Amino acid sequence: MPLPTNQLRLAMVAGEPSGDLLAASLLGGLQARLPASTHYYGIGGQRMLAHGFDSHWQMDKLTVRGYVEALGQIPEILRIRGELKRQLLAERPDAFIGVDAPDFNFNVEQAARDAGIPSIHFVCPSIWAWRGGRIKKIAKSVDHMLCLFPFEPAILDKAGVASTYVGHPLADEIPLEPDTHGARIALGLPADGPVIAVLPGSRRSEIALIGPTFFAAMALMQEREPGVRFVMPAATPALRELLQPLVAAHPQLALTITDGRSQVAMTAADAILVKSGTVTLEAALLKKPMVISYKVPWLTGQIMRRQGYLPYVGLPNILAGRFVVPELLQHFATPEALADATLTQLRDDANRRTLTEVFTEMHLSLRQNTAAKAAEAVVRVLEQRKGRA
């Protein structure tokens, strides 16, 4: 069935940098399949803007982490959400696409769906890991879910939610065999000798909580492995500034801080010490041994612990269905423990070979041409809507 010939309008919301990456991938796929006149608007980041996206609000207004930490931003977030819903109901786009940010987007998606506007959500929340009761909210809010991981559609099907497994765009982007030598040349690092990438996060609260511990662990590792070098990507000038007091407190470290280029930094490494998050999947796709860690404020940690179901939080372990890399969380994330675990990952060649096999299988499973699959699923929803009109 052909799509409408009049101008299509698709409203989209991405609430944080990882969502901006996914949404930009989807936009590229849609622009290859929908008329050039299609108007894409809503809330997005720099990657979406590069695709001509019309962002009516700044994405960073929605970027929060943790229960307690979000309290101060709630009034502003509620104001933006209210304005967005009023705009959607007045303009009635052909579909609303929420990209991740479920606590924000599900409310908007339900309002859109109740008004007869198809609602699509890109990235199934981790209901299989914690807060499984959210599946009821999904069933009320979402017409179609675009899933990054292969086991998610079966879970959604039980709740009557239509879905499509589209794979993960990082698996399409990252080559199956990383070029470690080329990455070291790009960063001006020696071709020989051990390199450890350290990624403590990108938010002020993350740096404050885990930054000192990571730097203390690096100091211990350098004592125990004298030839080791460290590389740490700083996504923004503001993040580099946040790191400066920690750098100044450890002048002995053989540390290179890069301006962004986190993927290049991880590619150059022999092992990685990383804060839990999407970046751990990126590290797995780069076939790197790693140690996963995080620290959150005590109350946030207690809430998360009580609502969790899986024994692991890192995506490599979740996808493998078992611990394939170590996780050191909260009070277990001491400098000594992090240093010991990271050096073990660095030195254990047999474990490195095993991880390469596990991560290669994972990579192939997730490599689905996500931009095309996700865009095709959206087009099908639009065609179904036209068929009902």
Swiss-Prot record:
InterPro entries named among the record's database cross-references: Glyco_trans_19 (IPR003835)
Annotated metabolic or biological route of this protein: Bacterial outer membrane biogenesis; LPS lipid A biosynthesis
Protein origin, superkingdom: Bacteria
Any single biological process term in GO: lipid A biosynthetic process
Catalytic activity: a lipid X + a UDP-2-N,3-O-bis[(3R)-3-hydroxyacyl]-alpha-D-glucosamine = a lipid A disaccharide + UDP + H(+)
SUPFAM superfamilies associated with the record: UDP-Glycosyltransferase/glycogen phosphorylase
Keyword line: Glycosyltransferase, Lipid A biosynthesis, Lipid biosynthesis, Lipid metabolism, Transferase
Keyword RNA-binding: no
GO cellular component, one term: membrane
A Gene Ontology molecular function term of the record: phospholipid binding
Function, in words: Condensation of UDP-2,3-diacylglucosamine and 2,3-diacylglucosamine-1-phosphate to form lipid A disaccharide, a precursor of lipid A, a phosphorylated glycolipid that anchors the lipopolysaccharide to the outer membrane of the cell.
HAMAP family: LpxB
PANTHER family assigned: LIPID-A-DISACCHARIDE SYNTHASE, LIPID-A-DISACCHARIDE SYNTHASE, MITOCHONDRIAL-RELATED
Protein name: Lipid-A-disaccharide synthase
Organism, as annotated: Burkholderia vietnamiensis (strain G4 / LMG 22486) (Burkholderia cepacia (strain R1808))
